[in-house]
Structures are given as structure tokens and as C-alpha cells.
From Swiss-Prot:
Function field: Catalyzes the NADPH-dependent reduction of 7-cyano-7-deazaguanine (preQ0) to 7-aminomethyl-7-deazaguanine (preQ1).
GO biological process: queuosine biosynthetic process; tRNA modification
Assembly information from the UniProt record: Homodimer.
Protein's name according to its UniProt entry: NADPH-dependent 7-cyano-7-deazaguanine reductase
Organism: Salmonella agona (strain SL483)
Domain of life per record: Bacteria
Length: 282
């Protein structure tokens, strides 16, 4: 259980509550969650963040009416900057997108600008939005995370409670290595509803070699942990940086979609360009 799971800042969220679906545009449906909720316990403040990054959202269920009433569909790509005051709560995002369904917009650009304006207001930070026609995306191959998968280890696990203990003394040798490690076994739970969130994670670092068994045990320990996607990625970044002390570090997770949305947060302290192709489970 997260230390802030019952924080009053979460009281007003529609997440976990019965809600009506509106199909006429309503920006008030968007709800933000302060990033400080998970950053404060980690000792992170806006002026001492050890990373940069973004939350990348893919919007698969986006539709509206053109000026003549003909339905339009698109796939949206949203990038929410890590410096925003709030992250966007996903159920409210879904409800907000549904409100476009029976609303007329003159142009695609008007839709894009509307999304960008509303998301920036909710997040209190920088947001960029791109809209793609379906024929732009047809035929795109399923992508994969570059790196060495650490999942196929012959180990026994019987503890699924989150702990950083596995990262203590998890590095060895004095030689600097540079490697990219991948796991598809990341599973955490929604902070509010405790529904499972499934993801794949890519960890790039340069530093003393990290023990792969200990790293995998640490990642598996999220299995009963309740936090939002973005919060988990920041926790993983912070824990690896704290205990393993790599010179450079990038952590990137791509989660399976829910409600027509997938969330793909990344954090890095070096030059890092995230590949945005959808993975096999997305």
C-alpha cells in the first residue's frame, strides 16, 4: 500500500466510482493528480528532480463529428512533460475523450488544439498532441524493446510485496558496463481501484554491473504494489539510482491499454529518445 493512497487529493476522483458517460464536449471531466504525492516520499521536489522525461499516451478511441455531422476517427499521440504539476488521471481522460463523440468540430486542427489546451490546463504543464489518420498507421509492425530480456531465469520467488531490499548490494565489480535490460513481468495495481496494470520495462544504464536476478526480483515485487504507472516508473528510476548508483540511467515502461488508452512513461538523466512503436501486448 502506498503511503499516500488515502490522501485527500484523491478524494474527488471519479476513478472507482459509478459515472455517467457524456457525449458532448466537456473539458471539466479531466482530473489531475499532483505529482508531489509520490515524489515527496521519495525526497524529490520540483527543483531537484534527478531526471527528465515524459508520459506518452496513445489514444485509440478518439472520435468526433465534422462540420457536416460525419463521424471522424483518429489515433492520438500525447506527450505530457515530467515537469507538469499534475499527471492526468486515466479514467477522467477516457470520459473526457468520450465527450467529443457527438460534438462538431470544423477541422482536425481544431480538435488537436482543443485537446492540447485542455490537457495543459489540467496538467498545469507542457503537453503536445498529434493526431494520426488510420491510413498513416496501417501496416506498421509490432515493435519490441531493444535489449537483453532478463525474464528467463531459473529462480524461485515466493515474495510479491514491494521492497527495495533486492537492490541493496546489487552491483558488483569496479568495471563500468553499459547495457540495456528488458522485462515483460512488470505488474502493479491501480492506486485507487487496485485493478492490475501490466507493462514491459526497459532499463538502460552505464555503471557497475547490476545483478540481473536481484533486479528481476525487485521488479516482481511490484506485483501487489498500488501506484499509478507514472509513479511506478519514477520509483524504479529513483531506487536504481539510489542503490546501484549508475552514471547514466533511463527507465521506460510501456503498459497495456485500458479504456482505449495506453500510458508509456519514461525518465532519464542522459540523452534518451524513446521508441514509440506499440509492443506485442499493446
Amino acid at each position: 500500500m502506498s503511503s499516500y493512497e488515502n490522501h485527500q487529493a484523491l478524494d474527488g476522483l471519479t476513478l472507482g466510482k459509478s459515472t455517467d458517460y457524456r457525449d458532448n464536449y466537456d473539458a471539466s471531466l479531466l482530473q489531475g493528480v499532483p505529482r508531489s504525492l509520490n515524489r515527496d516520499p521519495l525526497g524529490l521536489t520540483a527543483d531537484n528532480l534527478p531526471f527528465h522525461g515524459a508520459d506518452i499516451w496513445t489514444l485509440y478511441e478518439l472520435s468526433w463529428l465534422n462540420s457536416q455531422g460525419l463521424p471522424q476517427v483518429a489515433v492520438g499521440h500525447v506527450e505530457l512533460d515530467y515537469t507538469s504539476v499534475n499527471l492526468i488521471e486515466s479514467k477522467s481522460f477516457k470520459l473526457y475523450l468520450n465527450s467529443f463523440n457527438q460534438t462538431r468540430f470544423d477541422t482536425w486542427e481544431t480538435v488537436r488544439q482543443t485537446l492540447e489546451r485542455d490537457l495543459r490546463a489540467c496538467a498545469q504543464g507542457n503537453v503536445s498532441v498529434r493526431l494520426h489518420r488510420l491510413d498513416e498507421l496501417e501496416g506498421q509492425p509490432v515493435a519490441h524493446f531493444h535489449g537483453t530480456c532478463i525474464d528467463d531465469q531459473d529462480i524461485s520467488i515466493d515474495n510479491y510485496q514491494f521492497t527495495t531490499d533486492y537492490l541493496q548490494h546489487a552491483v558488483s565489480g569496479e568495471k563500468q558496463v553499459e547495457e540495456t535490460l528488458v522485462s515483460h513481468l512488470l505488474k502493479s495495481n491501480c492506486l485507487i481501484t487496485h485493478q492490475p496494470d501490466w507493462g514491459s520495462i526497459q532499463i538502460q544504464y552505464r555503471g557497475r554491473k547490476i545483478d540481473r536476478e536481484k533486479l528481476l526480483r525487485y521488479l516482481v515485487s511490484f506485483r501487489h504494489h498500488n501506484e499509478f504507472h507514472e509513479q511506478c516508473v519514477e520509483r524504479i528510476f529513483n531506487d536504481i539510482l539510489r542503490f546501484c548508483q549508475p552514471e547514466t540511467l533511463s527507465v521506460y515502461a510501456r503498459y497495456t491499454r485500458r479504456g482505449g488508452l495506453d500510458i508509456n512513461p519514461w525518465r532519464s538523466n542522459t540523452d534518451f529518445v524513446p521508441a514509440t512503436g506499440r509492443l506485442a501486448r499493446q
